[in-house]
Curated annotation (Swiss-Prot):
The protein, known as: Optineurin
Pfam family membership, one: NEMO
Compositional bias per record (Basic and acidic residues), positions renumbered to this chain: 11-22
Location of the protein in the cell: Cytoplasm; Cytoplasm, Perinuclear region; Golgi apparatus; Golgi apparatus, trans-Golgi network
Alphabetical list of InterPro entries matching this protein: CC2-LZ_dom (IPR032419), NEMO_N (IPR021063), NEMO_ZF (IPR034735), Optineurin/NFkB_EssMod (IPR051301)
Residues the record lists as binding Zn(2+): 534, 537, 550, 554
GO cellular component labels: autophagosome; cytoplasm; Golgi apparatus; nucleus; perinuclear region of cytoplasm; recycling endosome
Record keyword Magnesium present: no
Tissues showing expression: Expressed in erythrocytes, skeletal muscle, heart, spleen and brain. Weakly expressed in lung and liver (at protein level).
Region of interest (Disordered), residue spans: 1-33, 245-274, 496-524
Domain statement: The LIR (LC3-interacting region) motif mediates the interaction with ATG8 family proteins. Ubiquitin-binding motif (UBAN) is essential for its inhibitory function, subcellular localization and interaction with TBK1.
Cysteine-cysteine disulfides: none
Length: 556
């Protein structure tokens, strides 16, 4: 019975019935007799009404939950749409930024080319490759700074994407303002750079030369100090060694004097004098030790300074080598740019000539068209006069006048046909020239491609040529080493043969350690074997190559 209240109370009035049953169980059974049937019916009706009310409340609650869920789904869809809208706006802003960056770079390149031309015209005598390299470095740094600014703008836009839709217009306005501001700043910087770059480069080159000279002077001075300190240290060490030897001698003498106790007073006086000399020598040694320690400390300091200066020299050498390579690359780039500029100028001159020709032909065409229009007007007037004459003097017209008019009409038609032919020819010429202009643009693009391919092939050939030269140098070096080794082998063989020939008569005088039974049959075999024997250790070897190797090892 205790489990019944946990069941759903809104269905079929089970909750109230369970309460009633619990109450009836707790009370005595006679209480049932107190309820009349009418009261029981009323209670049942009340329970049914309560059950219906609970069902309606549950339905309303479920409907409200459904409505809330639908509102949440609509809100989520709106959020997704807003997010997609913001993302599209961000992408569009990014594309605009990239386009502006490309335009900015193109404008900068045009400005740089114009500035280089102006500076080349103004400073042809004083312009050097180093200055051009520094200019390019400063431009690269400026472009890097602009790139960093653009990246910062993009990050700001990414942060602003998470803000509400009301701020989108503000973001776009700010972005456009920043792009315009960067473009203006770039233009201002480019105009200022043209005026200040020469002075800056001169001052920088002078400062660098002064710094290098001062560093070289300090290095030379420190090296001189180091040499002096090392010489002084060697001298002090020698003096210390001499004093130590003298001290050891004096100590030996004093020990001898102490052992021989039965010596005279003169010897005692000499021993006292020796003791005083020993003390003075000890003092000198202490002073020398102090000087040595000071010299050691100075040496350590000088060595540290030398290491630092060597590191500085290495870094400067690396910087110089990198600058030299950059200079070479930039000189090559400048050379190629000048070549391309000359080619572009020649192409532009050709295009201008073609344009002038087309302009002349257009003027001719317009003049011919005017003449044609005039002739048409004259023809129409003549036709009108003919028609009028035919109408007015149909019967009185003379044959001569008619023939003259017919001749004029024929001449006008012939002139019109000739003019029409000329106009057709001019149209064909104009079409051909337009095709030539299109082919000129295609040929220009092909020329640029061929130029880049030619430069790439040229660089590859230069690399191959350098590698060939290096290999040739290595081959010559190896051939020289081989020749030297062969000469050494021959000389060593000659020396060995000489030694072997010098020792041969000694061996003839030496007694033979041969068994008696062998006799003259084993002698040629021994001679053949002794041909490939070592002259130093008399080791028998099978062939000449192993003999040479063994002789070299044995001599060493």
């Amino acid at each position: 019975m205790s489990s019944k209240p946990q069941i759903r109370p809104a269905e079929n009035g089970e909750h109230c019935r369970s309460k009633m049953e619990n109450g009836m169980d707790s009370m005595a059974p006679p209480t049932l007799s107190t309820y009349t049937p009418e009261e029981m019916v009323q209670q049942m009706k009340e329970l049914i009404t309560e059950n219906n009310e609970l069902k309606e409340a549950m339905k309303l609650h479920n409907q409200a939950m459904k409505d809330r869920y639908e509102e949440l789904s609509i809100w989520r869809e709106k959020q997704k749409e807003e997010r997609e809208f913001y993302e599209t706006k961000f992408k569009e802003a990014k594309q605009c930024l990239l386009a502006k960056c490309v335009e900015n770079e193109q404008l900068q390149q045009q400005l740089q080319s114009l500035k280089e031309r102006e500076e080349g015209a103004e400073m042809e005598g004083c312009a050097t490759p180093e200055k051009e390299a520094r200019q390019l470095k400063s431009k690269v740094q400026r472009l890097q700074a602009e790139k960093a600014d653009l990246l910062a703008i993009i990050s700001e836009l990414q942060v602003k994407l998470n803000i509400a839709s009301a701020e989108d217009s503000f973001v776009e306005i700010g972005m456009n303002e920043e792009v315009n501001r960067t473009a203006r700043e770039n233009q201002d910087n480019s105009s200022e750079m043209a005026s200040n770059i020469a002075v800056y480069i001169r001052s920088k080159s002078a400062d660098e030369s002064k710094n290098l000279e001062s560093e070289e002077l300090t290095v030379s001075q420190l090296l001189c100090c180091l040499r002096n300190e090392t010489q002084r240290r060697e001298k002090l060490e020698k003096e210390l060694q001499d004093h130590k030897e003298r001290l050891s001698k004096m100590e030996n003498e004093t020990s001898n004097c102490l052992e021989s106790g039965t010596q005279t007073n003169q010897e005692e006086e000499s021993s006292e004098a020796i003791g005083s000399e020993v003390e003075s020598l000890k003092k000198q040694i202490c002073a020398l030790f102090k000087e040595l320690q000071e010299a050691h400390e100075k040496l350590k300091e000088a060595e540290l300074i030398q290491k630092k200066l060597q590191e500085k020299c290495q870094t400067l050498e690396k910087v110089n080598s990198a600058a030299a390579t950059e200079l070479e690359e930039k000189q090559q780039l400048i050379y190629t740019i000048k070549k391309l500029e000359l080619q572009v100028e020649s192409v532009q001159a050709e295009v201008k000539l073609e344009q002038a020709k087309t302009q002349d032909e257009k003027t001719r065409y317009s003049s011919l068209q005017d003449a044609y229009n005039k002739l048409l007007a004259e023809l129409t007037e003549a036709m009108k006069t003919i028609s009028e004459m035919k109408v007015k003097e149909h019967d009185r017209v003379d044959k001569v006048v008619v023939e003259e008019l017919n001749a004029k009409v024929l001449l006008a038609e012939q002139a019109l046909a000739a003019k029409q032919l000329q106009m057709d020819e001019m149209k064909q010429l104009i079409a051909k020239q337009e095709e030539d202009l299109e082919t000129m643009a295609v040929l220009r693009a092909q020329m640029e491609v061929y130029c880049s391919d030619f430069h790439a092939e040229r660089a590859a050939r230069e690399k191959i040529h350098e590698e060939k030269e290096q290999l040739a140098v290595q081959l010559a070096y190896l051939l020289k080493e081989q020749q030297n080794l062969e000469d050494l082998g021959r000389s060593s063989l000659a020396e060995m043969q000489n030694r072997h020939g010098a020792r041969a008569p000694d061996r003839e005088h030496s007694p033979r350690l041969v068994q008696r039974g062998t006799g003259s049959q084993e002698w040629p075999e021994q001679r053949n074997i002794s041909i490939y024997s070592c002259p130093k250790c008399e080791e028998i070897l099978p062939d000449l190559d192993t003999l040479q190797i063994h002789v070299m090892d044995c001599i060493n």
